[in-house]
Amino acid sequence: MPDSDITILLVDDEEMVLTSIRSFLAIETDYRVHTFTSPVKALQELDRLNIDLVISDYLMPDMDGITFLGRVKERFPQVPRILLTGYADKENTMKAINDVGLYQYIEKPWNNDDLKLIIRNGLEKTILLKRLEERIREVERAQNELTEVQKQILRIFA
């Protein structure tokens, strides 16, 4: 899948963080990046964006990142979710990883190379899942065709 076909949703209440990550990804990739300062607004737009990966801040005024990513999971369980946190609270982060099924978390300040690697690996998971879903659909189509051929053969010899 070309980078230009990939859509990332980025949610953080700090405009500087959004600008920094969006600018970095614009330089390093061709990903489409949609940014929101409000998780509530991001959820309102979620269905129309066709996202491949989500990055969310942990502490935000409207809704915390764990709740937001949990709601993303309810609607798009296959989409990797990454938590961006300014707190080295490993216990709560691990709880979030388990409870919400996070793909990964990144501590602020982040290293751009690490961020790029985590995003790339998360997207690879998405791409592999999409390929698997397509293969499953192909097998189902082939199975349906085979069933129809079997019915035709039975009618001919019946």
What residue spans do the PLM features occupy?
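Two-component/phosphorelay signaling modules centered on CheY-like receiver
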Residues: 15-34
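Non-catalytic signal-transmission and effector/linker regions of two-component phosphorelay proteins
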Residues: 1-9, 22, 130, 134, ...
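Helix N-cap/capping motif at the beta->alpha junctions
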Residues: 35-44, 65
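Receiver (REC) domain active-site loop signature in two-component systems and cognate sites
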Residues: 60
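Alpha4 helix (beta4-alpha4-beta5 surface) of REC/receiver domains from two-component response regulators
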Residues: 67, 88-105
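Active-site beta3 strand of CheY-like receiver
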Residues: 9, 49-55
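Active-site residues of response regulator receiver
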Residues: 12, 57, 85
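C-terminal output helix
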Residues: 91, 110-119, 123, 127, ...
